[in-house]
Amino acid sequence: MTETAFETALAARTSDMIDACTRCGKCVEVCPVTGPAGVGDAAPQDVIGGVIDILQGGEGTAASLAWAKGCALSGDCIEACPEAINPRFLLAMTRVAVARRAVELRERRKTGIEHFRLVADGVKVLSSVQLTDDELARLGQKVGARLANGSTAKEGERPDFVFYTGCNVLKTPHIALYALDIMDALGVTYKVMGGPNHCCGVIQLRTGDTEVSGRQATSSLDRLAEGKTGVISWCPSCHVQFTETTIPTIEKMRGARPFEMTPFMLFLKPHLDRLRPLLTRPVAMRVALHRHPGIKGVTEAGIELLRMVPGVEIVDLDQPAVGLVGNALNALPEYKRSLHRAEREAAAAAGVDALAVIYHVDYREFCAHERDWPFRVVNVLEIVGASMGLDHATGFKRLKIMQDADAIVADCKDMLAARNIDPALAREVVLKAMLNEQPLPLGR
């Protein structure tokens, strides 16, 4: 099968990194998941050497395969590399190579389509039962009278930024609405893009289908290049997919970077002095922050933001910070459960009022635990919003705590009817995209 231009450039980038890699093993030495992933006592030099062997068409070693499959995208390896290459990207390409050899393209493509539909159905159903038409329009999912074309810029003008939601935050849309409220308060103009129509391509990349992944990502990238100052991202998975795979590959193809992409929390940093006076209402709360190190600076920005809120006391639970985001640990389910359990117990022992998360994935996985533990589960932006006098309903949490698919569908029957959504489809989504997404079982 003929390679696309994107695939050729992607392969060239991989080859360049392979050539630059000295097999020193420092990336393996700093990785926090070598133990849980089953790397064992293999020498770090041999582990990275096995990864390179796989990328060059070899079989690698059991330890190198385990490391690649268990990668949680923590990112420690990137800073540790003395050659300034990206081991996290090389591990992604290793998983692509393994998938290609193990499964025929037709089956991989079918799997990619199935996974994409699962996300698309989840986004459609779960956003539709929580949002009004105006709110859907505000999030770029429906053109409405309030927000023509999803942009807050004046007619005929380009917005300051494109705010790229990704797909899955639309399942917990109150988080994205708070982000828009904050940008409105700062006087920043933006156009909201996201959802399945602006897919980042990571779903297809995970199946080893670089052709479809590249095509989807490139199409989305070209549409994202509307902001005067770049793109603000919310989803960490989309951010890594674009900044480590798509944008550098497009740059290699076209000779120029189309735009810079900045995570929302890092976008806020230079605006904190303007945001501080808007935080007028005290929020008396002892808060522990669930942390992920995968995108450098995001956790620190979250802590800095919480410290600005009057009345908030930050409690350090002294727990490990691992992975890009919660679902990046899905290949290591027992390890993930142990991390979640230890954090819940530490939060309860510390007497916190709330366990706060930054990312939507963690919110979805954690929120129903509020039923059984003596603290709330909130997103950081909910706390900021409360101090600004803002409030959005947390419909996802309310529904998930019911823990009954039929009761949830019955609760949403009017919204489902208004949006012409089949209750049978809604029930399937509730099971797969809500109730089954519970790494640590409820209860204590």
Predicted regions and their residues:
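Short, charged low-complexity linear segments at domain edges
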Residues: 1-12, 41-62, 174-177, 329-330
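Iron-sulfur (Fe-S) cluster-binding modules
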Residues: 1-29, 33, 99-108, 156-159, ...
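A short, structure-level motif marking secondary-structure boundaries and short turns
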Residues: 2-3, 12-13, 62-63, 163-166, ...
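Iron-sulfur-cluster electron-transfer modules
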Residues: 18, 48-241, 245-246, 268-271, ...
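Local cysteine-cluster metal-coordination motifs and their immediate loop/turn environment
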Residues: 18-36, 68-84, 165-170, 196-208, ...
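Short, solvent-exposed polar/charged micro-motifs at secondary-structure junctions
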Residues: 202-204, 271-274, 325-328, 387-390
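Catalytic core of nucleotide-activated saccharide and alditol-phosphate transferases
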Residues: 258-272
